[in-house]
Amino acid sequence: MYWENINVQFGNILRKTRETRGLTQEEFALLCDISRAYYGRIERGEHSVTLDLCKKISDALGISLAELFADLP
């Protein structure tokens, strides 16, 4: 239950951050070197991410891992 909830929360944070930067899912997925479909599942909270992918995401956003996780409970 907790992991499902945190995956959804993380996905919501990613979506808001991506939209704030004016990027489409396709553009952001390319920056992270993953498919748009896979990225979409992450945004919807349907898939957990590895630490390696979290690092790619934070690099693509130009933020630290700490900043990426700052709004999670």
Annotated model-derived regions:
Residues E67-P73:
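Short amphipathic recognition helices of helix-turn-helix/homeodomain-type DNA-binding modules
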